[in-house]
Amino acid sequence: MNLDKRLNDVQFSKDWNLSRNISIPDDVIWPAYAAGSNIATRKVWGAVIEELAGKGMFLVGGSADLEPSNVTEGFAKLVKDFSKDNSSGMNLAYGVREFPMGAINNGIALHGGLYPFGATFFVFADYERPALRLRAIQKLPCISEYTHDSIYVGEDGPTHQPIEHLMAYRAIPNLL
């Protein structure tokens, strides 16, 4: 069926236009928190992507094997994994592959029609850095969620503490 015929379908046409313009649907109910609430930003992020899941936002993405820690597992359960057996899944189970995650998201953004995101710990963003740099240069519409960003984070010690990362990423034009 060609696109002109599909665009005559009211729902398809609405979804098509929404995906081409990457706009937020009117029926989104944003999570609300009281000022001063002691809530981790990753939990707010999780609530936001769960609300956007299935709202016609065409949000696609996933985590580099850290779904419970960066609070993307709710989204994954709602939209299901993309796989050879489920091409309608919107969760991309990247595994321990930050660079491919970034490169894939860039490709999705360049193609258009979907709004990609990827999530990992901030300390692992260095593995994604070449893709992030290209994303910033091209001003691509992608979201990167970096959690556990404190230099005092975690029982894993210095290997999981992003001490120099924020300064390095601020130096990339258009990134932040």
Regions found by a protein language model. Give the residues of each.
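Thiamine diphosphate
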Residues: 1-176
